[in-house]
Amino acid sequence: MKNPCNVIAIIGKPRDQQAIQTHKELYEWLTSEGYKVFIDDRLAAILDEIPQNHFASLVELGKNADLAIVVGGDGNMLGAARILSRFDVPVIGVNRGNLGFLTDLNPDDFQAALKAVLAGEYIEEERFLLEAEVHRHGQIKSHNAALNEAVLHPGQIAHMIEFEVYIDESFAFSLRADGLIVSTPTGSTAYSLSGGGPILSPSLNAISLVPMFPHTLSSRPLVVDGKRRIKLIVSPENRGTQEVSCDGQVSLPVSPGDEIHIYQSPNVLKLIHPKDYSYYHVLRNKLGWSSKLF
């Protein structure tokens, strides 16, 4: 993180009055500390007491901020990450969601922890993203990025599809299933975990492939090197439409016969944590693991 940190962005789409209050408190505290603060312009109508020239788009915030503070749950962090990862701006989260795997700071007592971070007492880690492209007749029809996962699934609920999986152009397996979750280590505690996938330490350079309700007893999750390129060829015999969902927020339409190319993005998310952060403490706390015996 740039030191000294002069320009700070506040990002997030609040779902309730408590989250709105956190945005206000952050803005007031940071400005009182002497920082230049800009806010996600999607909040301009909600925070109408703040001068309009203190609002900017996510792209502008990414270009100009030294630090971005995301208020909300992991969903807000995922949405911000897909844009902010294009820029060299570190991100820290204030949790106003449910689990909050990616948002560390307590909204009721963020000042002390944030002050320490701004003084240089923090842990910085890089989380890689995936790029997902839909190819049709040799051309890219659509693409997007995902911090958690890219998921091939049917457009209709509870409708099986058939597809082939290639890893670095080498045929791996075919599958008749509800879909396939292609997950980063960051996403291994999200949708992938619900689908029976493994938990991957965020420092691992690996990608997991997790079948969704496969019509076979032999199908199991597969972990491959993070530099491998995944190609899914959708059967031309599939009925209806399919989709590739990026982080559950962006959907790319897929037609029978299309190819989906998934690979590691050149961009990374720079995630900032307080100095006392422990990934395994987060797992134990969020997933309800047992405490120490002695």
Curated annotation (Swiss-Prot):
GO CC entries: cytoplasm
Catalysed reaction equations from the record: NAD(+) + ATP = ADP + NADP(+) + H(+)
Key words of the record: ATP-binding, Cytoplasm, Kinase, NAD, NADP, Nucleotide-binding, Transferase
Keyword GTP-binding recorded: no
Primary location group: cytoplasm
Residues that, per the record, bind NAD(+): D74, G75, N148, E149, H159, R176, D178, T189, A190, Y191, S192, L193, S194, Q249
Gene Ontology biological process terms from the UniProt entry: NAD metabolic process; NADP biosynthetic process
Subcellular location: Cytoplasm
Transmembrane region(s): none
Cofactor(s) needed by this chain: a divalent metal cation
Keyword RNA-binding appears in the UniProt entry: no
Catalytic site positions: D74
Enzyme Commission no: 2.7.1.23
UniProt GO MF annotations: ATP binding; metal ion binding; NAD binding; NAD+ kinase activity
Enzyme class of the recorded protein, top EC level: transferase
Matches recorded under Pfam families: NAD_kinase (PF01513), NAD_kinase_C (PF20143)
Annotated function: Involved in the regulation of the intracellular balance of NAD and NADP, and is a key enzyme in the biosynthesis of NADP. Catalyzes specifically the phosphorylation on 2'-hydroxyl of the adenosine moiety of NAD to yield NADP.
Family according to the record: Belongs to the NAD kinase family.
Full protein name: NAD kinase
Species annotation: Vibrio parahaemolyticus serotype O3:K6 (strain RIMD 2210633)
Gene this chain is encoded by: nadK
